[in-house]
Amino acid sequence: MSLSVDRLSLSSEQYTRWCAETPSLPLYVQPWWLLAASGCEEMPVLATRVAKEDAPTLVWPLFMPTRRHLIVTPYCQFTGPLSDRSGAVGEEPFDRDRYIAHLAAMEALGEALPSSLRYIEAHLPLDYWDWLPSETPAGVWRSSVAYTHRLDLTQRPPQELYNSLIRRKVRRATALGLRELWAETTKEATNVATCAEMLVELCRKSLQRSGGDRLCASSLRRLVTAAVARGQGALLLLLSPHTDEPVAGAFVAHHAGTAYYIAGGQARTSEGEDAMALLLDRLIIWSREADCHTFDFEGSIQRGIAFFFRSFGAVPHPYLRLQAGRQTLAMRLQLRRYYLQHLY
């Protein structure tokens, strides 16, 4: 079965409209999120469409900080070629014609990528593996599996799913009398900016202790501002009753019924030891009140704390991390310059 496939370049208006008409897409690929995370004024979007169809079949927002890099945008769990509907491959019953159409569209999309690319990254659901092209301008794909952790907010009170450790931490932190400072509206712009700076400092301290990557602070500030302005996010800080200094903080954004834990940090003090459990408990309650059915603990800057997430009753969900090509030293230095100018 041979299909004719059109290659398209979508304007920002066309991509925004396509996202609005495709409710299955997550927060991470929404136009406003991508622009705030990347610091770009506009992001090129490549698309393919099976002939005789009105809407694009596959769409790929291209974050290319240099002409040789196509990489994952900061604070984005999923990025890469997007389907016009979720489960196009793994759906029941199996739709053979749809599957073949996606294979053809994906092959055309791979061929349309800029030939200058030498290194490509993508994070995608597992079912994409069956229809990814084996070749890219940067070479063949290499894959690994990563996990996000999701908590179902619909079945029963989430607190019933917490293990004994988390319940004990929440009780101890509650007894400390920590003061809550929220940034969830733009009525006090200064408050949002001040809270964002406090969160940045807490995240930096946490990353320094864990030996993690450098914080994309500029991206985080823009995301907090954009999400709060749209009514799709909240930043919560817990302050010491003795010093009025923040001991823990986190930023959560939501879209289409899912709340996403984006970033968080805590101070290395006796008060901060249990504060993060109380903080997340408060944000989970906030997410339910915002009519979210799922709390996603992905935490784009958090590494090595999966056990902590599972202690809240969250269930691991696998996804693909894909890479093609290699970075030379010159490419790494060029990419670092971009990060220093726009993201750090």
Please describe what each predicted stretch is:
Residues 64-80:
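Conserved acyl-donor/pantetheine-binding loop and adjacent beta-alpha core of acyl/acetyltransferases
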Residues 96-109:
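Well-ordered, non-membrane alpha-helical segments in soluble/globular domains
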Residues 111-127:
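ATP-hydrolysis module of ASCE/P-loop NTPase motor domains
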Residues 95, 221-334:
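Aromatic (often tryptophan-rich) hydrophobic motifs at membrane interfaces
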Residues 3-53, 62-68, 127-148, 156-270:
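A conserved beta-strand-loop-helix scaffold within acyl/acetyltransferase catalytic domains
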Residues 76-96, 154-156, 264-273:
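A short, internal acetyl-CoA/4′-phosphopantetheine-binding micro-motif in the GNAT/acyltransferase core
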Residues 42-45, 114-119, 233, 292:
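Short, high-confidence coil segments that cap the C-terminus of an alpha-helix
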Residues 2, 124-179, 294, 299-344:
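Terminal substrate-recognition subdomain of acyl/acetyltransferases
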